[in-house]
């Protein structure tokens, strides 16, 4: 039987059915593609929706985190303000300003979760006499905040650095304060005061050095007894390595070996300059210079080479000592070095329940009165004080609880406070107003300003050239001063006075305290624009 060709099997009805099936299959295929495309669209839309939702959630989370962060920062800022406000209640007695405004508060950290506050108080000197008060008060005021549970206070001091560090020799570039101890007369106990003051400052926590500037008669090798009594040289740096005793660095011509007994002035000045400027002093808070007696080349060299912060004047009750001291004070005033304290040595002794003044009294108080020096300290005739100078151990070290040691403690506090004030001083407070023809006075640490008549200021000079220092008799009479006199120059003298130069060449030292007591001008014409 012959095989039939497939086409022969086609029947119209079959073709129709096949076509129907084909159309149906096509429709099914189309429907499937449509559904698949719709599913893809739905899937894409769903993905986009999920992505959009995810983005929105991320934005929401970021916004929430930012809001939380802002709230956290706001709370932290509020907490920091609370702490600083509490600390601003503490006033520095020297500057008259709170410790926050002084810039003492450093490294403030707050942990709110634990209620813990940490900060550092950076004072101007490690020998600050009120550092314990600052620490206790800071703990107290911060702990009083309701959310604070623990307070951590760290005390520190500013790095040792002089005001004009860039203009100094390398050896002096890291010394904060240089104190001159001077008498301008030998044999009054100047070296004793210098050494005991230095070791008092060291006992208060300061880094201290002593420079014995007396080449002809050095006292330091006798008054202290270091293990190494010879100064060594650093061969690489060509600098002098100071010797040391009980933490205080020491330099003296007496430690330089056997030198010449006779030297001319220029040679001595060169030796002093070399010893002072090429020594590796390192970082010091205070360098105490034991000045040689007199007011000559050596003193001028020291004042020119070393930027003296302040001077301490040593005297005895005799009139002769007072005369030399007056010369020294005037020398320092011309060199713009403020004298911050007077030490009257060998002023009295106690015996049989009585106090005796074998050399009289009043010399130290006269210096304070005439020159406006703010502080006076008395030292008695005490055998142990002189004996300690011969034994090599200062009195303040061998007997720190003695009356003499307490006096030196008061002197040390005075020096620290006065040096801090001097370093904060910016400009003069006294000027001459040519339009009003009056001296305008603005006292430091005060908003008060007043005017003085120049002739009145000149007539109120209390120096030995105007007033006899013993009888009080006025040497310059009222008519000796012209009514229309005008000052030629007014310059500051440290933080306690000004130097006024008059047309006759006289240089008047006018302490601020004295200027405040002088009769003031009341009927002053109002200021008006001056035509140029």
Curated annotation (Swiss-Prot):
The protein's role, per its UniProt record: Required for photosystem I (PSI) biosynthesis and assembly. May serve as a chloroplast scaffold protein that specifically assembles iron-sulfur (4Fe-4S) clusters and transfers them to the chloroplast PSI and ferredoxin-thioredoxin (FTR) complexes. Can assemble a 4Fe-4S cluster and transfer it to apoproteins in yeast cells. Probably not required for assembly or stability of plastidic 2Fe-2S clusters.
Transit peptide location: 1-61
Tissues and organs where the protein is expressed, per its UniProt entry: Expressed in aerial tissues exposed to light. Very low expression in roots.
Superkingdom, natural source: Eukaryota
Transmembrane segment boundaries: none
Name under which the protein is recorded: Fe-S cluster assembly factor HCF101, chloroplastic
Disulfide bonds: none
One Pfam family this sequence matches: ParA
Cofactor: how and how many bound: Binds 1 [4Fe-4S] cluster.
Family membership noted in the UniProt record: Belongs to the Mrp/NBP35 ATP-binding proteins family.
GO BP of this protein: iron-sulfur cluster assembly
Gene: HCF101
PTM sites of type N-acetylalanine: 62
Alphabetically ordered keywords of this record: Acetylation, ATP-binding, Chloroplast, Iron, Iron-sulfur, Metal-binding, Nucleotide-binding, Plastid, Transit peptide
Disruption phenotype: Seedling lethality when homozygous due to impaired photosystem I (PSI).
Subcellular localization, as worded in the UniProt entry: Plastid, Chloroplast stroma
Main subcellular location of this protein, as a coarse class: plastid
Keyword ATP-binding recorded: yes
